[in-house]
Amino acid sequence: MPVKGLKVEAASIDPGHDAVILNPRDAEHLGVVAGLRASVVCRGRGVGAVVIVDPRVPERVAQLTKGLVERLGDCDTVDVHPIDVPPSFDAFKKRLSGARLSAAEYKMLIADIVAGYYDDAQIASFLVSQLYSKLADEELEHLIRAMVETGEVVKFGEPVYDVHSIGGVPGNSKVALLVVPIVASRGLLIPKTSSRAITSPAGTADTMEVLAKVAFKPQELHDMALRARGLIVWGGALNLAPADDIFVRVERRIGVDPPTQMVASILAKKLAMSVSRLVIDLPTGRGAKVQDESEAELLASMFLAQAGRLNIAMRVAITFGGEPIGFSVGPALEAREALQTLMKGDGASSLVEKACSLAGLVFELGGVVPRGRGYSLACEILRSGAAYRKFREIIEVQEGDPDIKPEDIKLAPKQFTLEAPRDGIVTMIDNRAISLAARAAGAPEDKGAGIQLHVKTGYRVRKGDPLLTIYASSDTRLHEAVRLLDEYNAVLIEGVVVKVLP
């Protein structure tokens, strides 16, 4: 029998997951066990949480972690009781065995995962099962729709456009800061929801946050988008497909990102934003998530198959991802480069060509221009200053300063410049080394940290020329970033003469 009406207090600890902290006497009376899960119920809605027992907690008090409070809402009291086997457990075991699940089974399973009735080990096994027992197209559609149904859906009453990159390439987060205003300047609605960085030095939301606020409620997002026609906001504050946030957290811990789950997560978020016209960017190359073109084409076919099922008009671009995009890596540095490019109407070819190519595909999807003409229109909008003017509107509607200049953006105070050890030609810039070093320097948590590149592949350099500059806020972080660059040989320089034969 559950103890009724435990008084709610905020927990002073954050174990990294939803937890309820109880006095040992209450835990014993409830029949709940430390380390296992219990259902915490507020106004008839139950959420699963790990039980922690602490004698310092007063009796008949339930201390709730911050995330649990946010999920339950405003509650003065809660009931706590042991979790029985969730209704979806048979479906869960069925999926682990490799059998297919129905739409109803996925709906029940995802609802129970969101409610907290599965622990991280069980969720990890669900994710790993997709590696050795791939989801069929119909089953993947069921998963996507179930993920959408458990969260908010924002509706706009008109066609919604978006561009989504699977990421994995340093410097990629700033591309959206060009694409969105280019597209929005022609009146197309592109309220882009973006993630924070997971394993990279900057996510699009991290970079945009240097310039404006990115966390808004669904109704705020709706109203702002209709005013500015374009937004760049953080999706994590919107409760869109909340199962995705759970899956991402577990994927980070186990180092697994099944392709089917990647497709499901991306498309569920897009459906929750009522996106009906979507461009997918698959960066491909050494050090990217996708290593070669054949792998990219396989992933593209998965996206396109689901697009047909979900009534999304889609095009997939396989883009070069063999080295960083543009010259900057890290939130503040990337915000600077994006702003400079918009103000000048030109910039690094890898950044401008990618942004205009993706924006051009959106124009073609929307019927603004015929196929093959989108790129030139996007470039014209960028060069004319129309994209910069629209970006100022977006910054202002997101409560930022539209008059901000690149030089106003502060960088971390500690610097180290890596110099060329010899004359030669830059033959490789290692994505992994750049990402690791930028994160070691403090990015993305320290927005001013990161790496500014001074060269790209193909540049001719002389001994002592600057190759890149690292920015960090402490000597410790700076030294670790330098160590990683040296260990991984981040910038490879070859002599002009490769070999001499007699």
Curated annotation (Swiss-Prot):
Family, similarity comment: Belongs to the thymidine/pyrimidine-nucleoside phosphorylase family. Type 2 subfamily.
InterPro entries in the cross-refs: AMP_phosphorylase (IPR017713), Glycosyl_Trfase_fam3 (IPR000312), Glycosyl_Trfase_fam3_N_dom (IPR017459), Glycosyl_Trfase_fam3_N_dom_sf (IPR036320), Nuc_phospho_transferase (IPR035902), PYNP-like_C_sf (IPR036566), PYNP_C (IPR013102), Pyrmidine_PPase_CS (IPR017872)
Annotated function: Catalyzes the conversion of AMP and phosphate to adenine and ribose 1,5-bisphosphate (R15P). Exhibits phosphorylase activity toward CMP and UMP in addition to AMP. Functions in an archaeal AMP degradation pathway, together with R15P isomerase and RubisCO.
SMART domains: PYNP_C
CC annotations in GO: cytosol
Highest taxon listed in the record's lineage: Archaea
Protein's UniProt name: AMP phosphorylase
Protein EC: 2.4.2.57
Binding residue positions for AMP: 168, 195-200, 204, 265, 289
Segment forming the signal sequence: none
An example molecular function term from Gene Ontology annotations: AMP binding
Protein keywords: Glycosyltransferase, Transferase
Residues forming the catalytic site: 257 (proton donor)
Keyword Glycosyltransferase: yes
Enzyme class: transferase
Matches recorded under HAMAP family: AMP_phosphorylase (MF_02132)
Catalytic activity: AMP + phosphate = alpha-D-ribose 1,5-bisphosphate + adenine; CMP + phosphate = cytosine + alpha-D-ribose 1,5-bisphosphate; UMP + phosphate = alpha-D-ribose 1,5-bisphosphate + uracil
A GO BP entry: pyrimidine nucleobase metabolic process
